[in-house]
Design a protein with these regions (language model features):
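Conserved NAD(P)H cofactor-binding loop of Rossmann-fold oxidoreductase domains
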Residues: 88-93
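Substrate-binding pocket helix/loop in short-chain dehydrogenase/reductase
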Residues: 96-98, 104-109
Length: 259
């Protein structure tokens, strides 16, 4: 499927993993791109790659840390007119809550929650005025259950899920043509694992497959995007299982990641 020229998508966390692969997919659909990440080298590399492959599109990069909320406002002021917003930036930390670094957790909350809150609200207001646009918030299957040994990360993803569900209902009630979607992947082979200092015991999906699935479903206005059969089963498990059992399952799952 080939989209019209001059459509514009903003992707955070675009220098690697799912965000980078989403950029590749949207570039093939002739979207102009605004790519945001802390890693300037990674952004420059993907920009050069995509411009070489498609000279019809414009790509703007913003090497900035969305943990700093002023950067979120600055980004919006510089790039107001977009058609697609993908809130993908985020990271996790492993360890018992009493022992993990508080400053790193505050940074995680700012990145995983505050940046999503700010960008979703600012761009949603504009999209509602135009009565068109798509927002894709990247959460995690982790957001459907408590997460001992990654307590703060699981909590941030639960926030994103709850927020996105509520916004979707508000849009439906006002019969808006603006669509919001929620991507909840499980294990994915990305740089996330290195940052969180964990290793998945079950094979992760490739970031390319997750990105392709997510973009396809978002453009079809699918709300809950669950890539892979195991993730769909995991979501169903979370809905019928008592919290005390989910806590125990999550604890042992995290424990196995560190051996």
């Amino acid at each position: 499927m080939e989209e019209e020229l001059n459509m514009k998508a903003l992707i955070t966390g675009a220098s690697s993993g799912i965000g980078r692969d989403m950029a590749r997919i949207l570039a093939k659909l002739n979207y102009n791109l605004i790519l945001v990440a802390r890693n300037e080298d990674g952004l420059t590399k993907i920009k050069n790659e995509l411009e070489t492959e498609n000279n019809k599109i414009n790509i703007t990069i913003y090497p900035m840390d969305l943990n700093i909320k002023e950067n979120c406002y600055k980004l919006y002021e510089n790039e107001k007119n977009i058609d697609v917003l993908i809130n993908n930036a985020g990271f996790g930390l492993f360890g018992e809550f009493a022992e993990t670094d508080l400053e790193k957790e505050i940074t995680m909350i700012n990145t995983n929650i505050t940046a999503v809150q700010i960008l979703t609200k600012l761009y949603l207001k504009d999209m509602i005025k135009k009565d068109k646009g798509n927002i894709l918030n990247v959460a995690s299957i982790a957001g459907f259950m408590p997460g001992p040994l990654m307590a703060t990360y699981y909590a941030t993803k639960n926030y994103v899920i709850a927020l996105t569900r509520a916004v979707r209902k508000e849009l439906k009630k006002k019969k808006s043509n603006v669509k919001i979607s929620l991507l909840c992947p499980g294990p994915v082979d990305t740089n996330f694992n290195k940052v969180a200092n964990v290793k998945f015991k079950i094979p992760g999906l490739s970031s390319e497959k997750v990105a392709q699935y997510a973009i396809d479903k978002m453009l079809k206005n699918k709300f809950m995007i669950l890539p892979g059969t195991l993730i769909k089963i995991g979501k169903a498990f979370s809905e019928i299982t008592p919290d005390i059992i989910k806590e125990e399952v999550a604890y042992h799952a995290q424990k196995r990641k560190r051996g």
